[in-house]
Every structure is written in C-alpha cells, then in structure tokens.
C-alpha cells in the first residue's frame, strides 16, 4: 500500500500515459484562485457540501488555475490520479481514486463520500477526470508482470490503504477504546479528532476546520497548523 501527501496529482491520457510531471502544490499558479472560484459558487454552500477548509493549495484551485490558463494537459487528460493513486497505477495498471486522498481535494461531497459533481460542473471541469472512488482495504490490483519479474515478488496484491499520509498515521494511533485528540506533525501539523459524520456548520467553516476522510468510515475533523516547513 502507498500513502503520500495530499492534494497533488497527475493526469493520464486515453492511452494511459502520464501527461507531464505533477506540479507541487507550493507552485504560485494557485495565487488568487479562491477569489476567482467563489465568483462561480457560494463559499458557505460549498463548505456545507465538501467540508474542506479553503486553502489555495487544494486540488480544486490547481485545476481551476489550469482551466483559466487553458492548460493543454487538461484538454486531453482522461483521468486524474492523486499521488498514491498514480504510484499504484504505475505498479498495477489499474486507475482509481482512494477515498481518503480524494477528500483532500475540496472536490468530494463529505456526506455521500463521492465526487461533488455540483462543484465540478459549476467550475466547468471535465467530469470524466474523476474516476471510481474506492475505500481503504480495497485490492487495487496485482503487480504488473514485468515489475513482479524484476523484483522477484510475484503476483503481489497492491492494497488501497488510507492513502493520505495523515489518514494512515491517525489509524495507527493506539487509542481505540476512548475518544482522543491527535497531533500528526510533518510538513504541516494536523490537530484534530475522529468523528463518525462530517461537521459542516458555519461555525466550523469560520474556525477553518476541515473534514477529511479516514479509515473505517471515520472523518478526521482537524485544523492544519504550523508544521516543520
């Protein structure tokens, strides 16, 4: 299984080829994009659907920047794969989107745990980019024959873990018996709790809380705060 940081992605074409290297979320292309996006939709309603804190780095704003700049990759792309989805695709040839990593995009409906097609349509993004959502624990596929042969591993299954690194970190917290708060530190520090349902109130939006997907049907209700970068 593979986990990585959130929001970043690669685009593959109809032949299954990667269309250029993924762009880091710290690239300046998303500057000013939230203001542009919320000319197309209501920010309050958007949070009530996605439950995600508005941050310029999020996938939504990366894609809208590409659209605004008429990026040729967006015109010919067949599917979007987040970083762990992309590496799993390289290993198996199977393209799908794991739930936890997809939830970081600001393009997922927090209640249905499927794509927010209202958001996608409002921004004029190609619907076909957004593939099947799979849950942690799903078998993505088996190693490609050439990789299995080169590594000597044979037909090993590749599993969809909690593919956002924080989702896997929180799952490993040894505190199953009682409610706990967690602090996961790295590039960012993520301070929060696990809940069964997203918290989509106006108070949560104003306080800049985010609802990210977790393992075993949980929601990670948290804040992004200062980390090590």
Map each language-model feature to its residues.
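A short beta-strand-loop micro-motif that forms or neighbors metal/cofactor-
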Residues: 43
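Gly/Ser-rich phosphate-binding catalytic loop and adjacent alpha/beta segment
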Residues: 30-33, 39-40, 52-56
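Short, small/polar residue-rich loop motifs at catalytic or cofactor-binding pockets
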Residues: 4-6
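Glycine-rich phosphate-binding loop of actin/hexokinase-like ATP-binding domains
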Residues: 8-36, 77, 81-116, 153-229
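Gly/Ser/Thr-rich active-site cleft segment
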Residues: 46-166
């Amino acid at each position: 299984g593979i986990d990585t940081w959130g929001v970043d992605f690669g685009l593959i074409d109809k032949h299954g080829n990667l269309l250029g290297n993924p762009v880091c979320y710290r690239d300046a292309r998303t500057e000013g994009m939230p203001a542009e996006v919320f000319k197309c939709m209501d920010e309050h309603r958007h949070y009530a659907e996605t439950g995600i804190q508005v941050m310029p780095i999020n996938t939504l704003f990366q894609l809208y920047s590409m659209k605004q700049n008429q990026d040729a990759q967006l015109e010919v792309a067949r599917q979007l794969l987040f970083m762990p989805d992309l590496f799993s695709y390289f290993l198996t040839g199977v393209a799908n989107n794991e739930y936890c990593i997809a939830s970081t995009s600001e393009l997922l409906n927090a209640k249905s745990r499927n794509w927010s097609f209202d958001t996608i349509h409002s921004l004029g993004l190609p619907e076909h980019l957004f593939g099947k959502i799979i849950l942690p624990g799903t078998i993505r596929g088996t190693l490609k024959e050439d990789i299995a042969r080169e590594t000597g591993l044979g037909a090993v299954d590749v599993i969809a873990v909690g593919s956002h690194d924080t989702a896997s970190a929180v799952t490993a917290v040894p505190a199953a018996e009682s409610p706990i708060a967690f602090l996961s530190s790295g590039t960012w520090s993520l301070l929060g709790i696990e809940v069964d349902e997203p918290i989509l109130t106006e108070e949560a939006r104003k306080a800049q809380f985010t609802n990210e997907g977790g393992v075993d049907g949980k929601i990670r209700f948290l804040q992004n705060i200062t980390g090590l970068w």
